[in-house]
């Protein structure tokens, strides 16, 4: 006997056996499909592991009690899913009617504009169409009267319903109806073929309470349809649009409770400074223009000063060369033994020029005096030969010397003197003058020296210390300065334009601020140098 006869039958099939059984089942189903396409549950004994899922699995029967799974034959007991999805509707051309979404919950007579053509104005093909004509006066009056009656009826009903006690409603007028019965004969309807029926509304009791309750909550009607969105089809966003839609988070400039490390660019983006338009004040442009003009003028002034310095250096160089040339010429003439009379002639010409210049000044002075007013003319004539000193030193006699003999005016018209016999003939007494020559106060002291009695209250007892002039004298003087010089003789003499400033101003006026002087100014320069050389 084989060993397999003693072993129990296997409960599980091998892979080969499963494949063979599947192949046989497919063949059987193929054979049965040719006969009948009806699907039925497997017979008893072969339902292990089988679960009915579809409606065809139940066949014509109900649920299988031996299969402990929720079963819904013919979908009985299955909860229906609630959905607000609408069934797709198409129009006569086969296009989907998207306006069904807007028409949901609305009456069929309500006009809803949901197409692009609704936005486009219609073209009037026939101007005489009666639908497009304006109503006449009779139609307007009729419609107005109907509207007024309907509104009055609605308002009266509302007012009457709100009143607690109201009068009885007016009865409608009686209506007469001609009635013809269907059964005609002597036995029916008392032998009458027609009857006239008078119909009257039954009178109502005004104190009768309302029969129907109307205080129930009526469900709210559907809302207004959503506005149709007429836009182009959606397109993919670009990178630039995505970056523009990035909204920076709200970052405080004062609080950071969590202690996060926030980059500076994110903090500035949250601040919103980049979103503000920058308005530049027009004064910045004015300031920049003013600075540019000032810089340009400063450069022009520097360049002009440099030109003036170069011209002065050139003139100095030319003067030095001319001097060296004259010295060389004199040395050559001295060696050759030739006597020159150039200096003598130059000296005579210089004297003649000075005389001409003085006479010209006198004539100009006379013309000015003749043109002046009478009071001013007398004042000029009075101060014509007046000598005004430069300074008045305090307590110092005038050091100016004069060639004229000066007399003391106090000696004249006196009863004493040499003619009176020297004090009555007493030779031993030398008192020719009754008082000292310098005993009286000088005019400068009377002008500038304050009186003690009047100014004592203001300045105090230290008046002598205040009026001393020693405090204005430096303790250590500069080298080369000698304060004990002799007084100058004659009026003050000034040098004539040592720096060439007048000449520079004349050139600037002539050329009108041009950067480079023209050649026409050179003769004037030589003429000015000649005048200066003659005055020297």
Curated annotation (Swiss-Prot):
GO terms for cellular component: catalytic step 2 spliceosome; nuclear body; nuclear matrix; nuclear speck; nucleoplasm; nucleus; spliceosomal complex; U2-type catalytic step 2 spliceosome. The modification Phosphoserine is found at residues 14, 182, 190, 224, 232, 234, 446, 479, 481. Residues 1-46, 209-233, 311-386, 470-536 are annotated as: Disordered. Its main location: nucleus. One of its GO terms (biological process) is mRNA splicing, via spliceosome. Residues 470-489, 503-530 have a biased composition (Basic and acidic residues). Changing residue 76 to A: Abolishes interaction with PPIL1. It holds the Pfam family SKIP_SNW. The keyword Acyltransferase does not apply. There is a cross-link at residues 23, 81, 97, 115, 122, 141, 158, 170, 193, 240, 258, 286, 339, 344, 416, 441, 452, 509 (Glycyl lysine isopeptide (Lys-Gly) (interchain with G-Cter in SUMO2)). It is found in: Nucleus. Residues 174-339 are annotated as: SNW. The modification N-acetylalanine is found at residue 2. Keywords: Acetylation, Host-virus interaction, Isopeptide bond, mRNA processing, mRNA splicing, Nucleus, Phosphoprotein, Spliceosome, Transcription, Transcription regulation, Ubl conjugation. One of its GO terms (molecular function) is nuclear androgen receptor binding. InterPro entries: SKI-int_prot_SKIP, SKI-int_prot_SKIP_SNW-dom. Belongs to the SNW family. Involved in pre-mRNA splicing as component of the spliceosome. As a component of the minor spliceosome, involved in the splicing of U12-type introns in pre-mRNAs. Required for the specific splicing of CDKN1A pre-mRNA; the function probably involves the recruitment of U2AF2 to the mRNA. May recruit PPIL1 to the spliceosome. May be involved in cyclin-D1/CCND1 mRNA stability through the SNARP complex which associates with both the 3'end of the CCND1 gene and its mRNA. Involved in transcriptional regulation. (Microbial infection) Is recruited by HIV-1 Tat to Tat:P-TEFb:TAR RNA complexes and is involved in Tat transcription by recruitment of MYC, MEN1 and TRRAP to the HIV promoter. Identified in the spliceosome C complex. Associates with U4/U6-U5 tri-small nuclear ribonucleoproteins (U4/U6-U5 tri-snRNPs). Component of the minor spliceosome, which splices U12-type introns. Interacts with SKI, SMAD2,SMAD3, RBPJ, RB1, PABPN1, MAGEA1, SIRT1, FOXN3, U2AF2, DAXX and ATP1B4. Interacts with PPIL1. Interacts with VDR and RXRA; preferentially associates with VDR:RXRA heterodimers. Interacts with NCOR2. Interacts with MAML1. Interacts with NOTCH1 NICD; the interaction involves multimerized NOTCH1 NICD. This is SNW domain-containing protein 1. It comes from Homo sapiens. The lineage of its organism: Eukaryota, Metazoa, Chordata, Craniata, Vertebrata.
């Amino acid at each position: 006997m084989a060993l397999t006869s003693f072993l129990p039958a296997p409960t599980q099939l091998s892979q080969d056996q499963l494949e063979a059984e599947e192949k046989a089942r497919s063949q059987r189903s193929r054979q049965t499909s040719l006969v009948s396409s009806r699907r039925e549950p497997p017979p008893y004994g072969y339902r292990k592991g089988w679960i009915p899922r579809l409606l065809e699995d139940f066949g014509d029967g109900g649920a299988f009690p031996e299969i402990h799974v929720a079963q819904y034959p013919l979908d009985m007991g299955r909860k229906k899913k609630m959905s607000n999805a609408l069934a797709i509707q198409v129009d006569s051309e086969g296009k989907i009617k998207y306006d069904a979404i807007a028409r949901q919950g609305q009456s069929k007579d309500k006009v809803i504009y949901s197409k692009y053509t609704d936005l486009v104005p219609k073209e009037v093909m026939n101007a005489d169409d009666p639908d497009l004509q304006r109503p006449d006066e009779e139609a307007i009056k009729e419609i107005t009267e109907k509207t007024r009656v309907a509104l009055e009826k609605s308002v009266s009903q509302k007012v009457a319903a709100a009143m607690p006690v109201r009068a009885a409603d007016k009865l409608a007028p009686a209506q007469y109806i001609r009635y013809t019965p269907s059964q005609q004969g002597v036995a029916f309807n008392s032998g009458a073929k027609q009857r006239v029926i008078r119909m009257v509304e039954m009178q109502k009791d005004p104190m009768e309470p309302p029969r129907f309750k109307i205080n129930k909550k009526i469900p709210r009607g559907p809302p207004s349809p959503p506005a149709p969105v007429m836009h182009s089809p959606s397109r993919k966003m670009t990178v630039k649009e995505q970056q523009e839609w990035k909204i920076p988070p709200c970052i405080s400039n004062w609080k950071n409770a969590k202690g996060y490390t926030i980059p500076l660019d994110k903090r500035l983006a949250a601040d919103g400074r980049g979103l503000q338009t920058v308005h530049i004040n027009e004064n910045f442009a004015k300031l920049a223009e003013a600075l540019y003009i000032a810089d340009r003028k400063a450069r022009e002034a520097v360049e002009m000063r440099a030109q003036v310095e170069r011209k002065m250096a050139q003139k100095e160089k030319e003067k030095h060369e001319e001097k060296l040339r004259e010295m060389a010429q004199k040395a050559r003439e001295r060696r050759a033994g030739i006597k020159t009379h150039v200096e003598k002639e130059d000296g005579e010409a210089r004297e003649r020029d000075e005389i001409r210049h003085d006479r010209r000044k006198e004539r100009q002075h006379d013309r000015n005096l003749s043109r002046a007013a009478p009071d001013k003319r007398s004042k000029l004539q009075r101060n014509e030969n007046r000598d005004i000193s430069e300074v008045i030193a305090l307590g110092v006699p005038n050091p100016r010397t004069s060639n004229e003999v000066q007399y003391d005016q106090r000696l004249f018209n006196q009863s004493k003197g040499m003619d009176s016999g020297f004090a009555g003939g007493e030779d031993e007494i030398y008192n020719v003058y009754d008082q000292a020559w310098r005993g009286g106060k000088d005019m400068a002291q009377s002008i500038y020296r304050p009186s003690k009695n009047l100014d004592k209250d203001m300045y105090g007892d230290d008046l002598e210390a205040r009026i001393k002039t020693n405090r204005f004298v430096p303790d250590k003087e500069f080298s080369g300065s000698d304060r004990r010089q002799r007084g100058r003789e004659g009026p003050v003499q000034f040098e004539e334009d040592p720096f060439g400033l007048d000449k520079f101003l004349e050139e600037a006026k002539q050329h009108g601020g041009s950067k480079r002087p023209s050649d026409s100014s050179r003769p004037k320069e030589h003429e000015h140098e000649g005048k200066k050389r003659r005055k020297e």
